[in-house]
């Protein structure tokens, strides 16, 4: 079964080994459940916003249909102060693309929420409360559009807000492989359901 992962630094696994990326860990978890999932094909880059992911997909369009497609995008829209309604429109278009890559089956698409970077060391000296509120607002948009489309919503934001030793990478911003393992754990149920549709 083919798995396509679309996103930004969180999907490419900035500052972690390739085996620590959450899509890779998710594929391993699905294989452990006897689901014959291949390694994920990843279209993602650190710093990408919704429009940049769209351009990235256009530059290297995936071929054929996928049995599972994941989407996680929006933190850089929030970080750069982009308009939330612009995010809605661009997210909706990306979600439609994801459904297209899944052979037109929204039930084969999983969307992960945006994690809260406001709790990290990188956010010291910034308004952590505002960052968290902005992330929540963007996620409310993502969740409503995802559910309206009939895709699966996976909320990793609460996990990103947990205070565990070793929860972030050495850069003090991006998640560690351990946190990504938790995300994969949270996504297993939705991904399993998606693959059985």
Task: For the regions a language model picked out, list residue spans one by one.
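Catalytic His-Asp segment of secreted/periplasmic serine-dependent ester chemistry enzymes
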Residues: 115-197
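Solvent-exposed loop/turn segments at secondary-structure junctions
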Residues: 9-12, 45-50, 75-80, 115-119, ...
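Short, solvent-exposed loop/turn segments at secondary-structure boundaries
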Residues: 14-19, 81-85, 130
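A short helix->loop->beta-strand "cap" motif at the edges of active sites that frequently abuts
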Residues: 99-108
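Conserved, well-ordered alpha-helix/loop/beta-strand core segments that scaffold catalytic motifs
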Residues: 70-72, 108-112
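Charged helix-capping and loop-helix junction motifs
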Residues: 85-94, 138
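Oxyanion-hole/transition-state-stabilizing segment in secreted/luminal serine hydrolases
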Residues: 50-89
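Serine-esterase "nucleophile elbow" of acetyl-processing enzymes
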Residues: 1-46, 56-65, 181
């Amino acid at each position: 079964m083919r798995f396509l992962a679309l996103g930004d630094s969180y999907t490419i696994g900035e500052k972690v080994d390739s085996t620590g990326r959450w899509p890779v860990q998710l594929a391993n978890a699905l294989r452990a459940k006897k689901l014959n999932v291949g390694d994920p094909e990843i279209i993602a880059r650190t710093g990408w916003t919704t429009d940049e992911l769209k351009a990235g997909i256009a530059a290297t369009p995936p071929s054929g249909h996928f049995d599972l497609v994941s989407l996680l995008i929006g933190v850089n829209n929030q970080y750069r102060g982009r308009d939330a309604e612009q995010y809605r429109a661009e997210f909706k278009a990306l979600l439609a693309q994801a459904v297209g890559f899944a052979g037109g089956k929204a039930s084969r698409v999983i969307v992960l929420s945006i994690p809260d970077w406001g709790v990290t060391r990188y956010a010291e000296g910034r308004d952590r409360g505002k960052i968290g509120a902005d992330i929540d607002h963007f996620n409310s948009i993502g969740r409503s559009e995802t559910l309206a489309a009939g895709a699966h919503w996976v909320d990793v934001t609460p996990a990103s807000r947990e205070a565990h030793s070793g929860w972030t990478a050495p850069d003090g911003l991006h998640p560690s492989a351990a946190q990504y393992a938790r995300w994969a754990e949270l996504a297993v149920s939705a991904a399993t359901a998606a693959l059985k549709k």
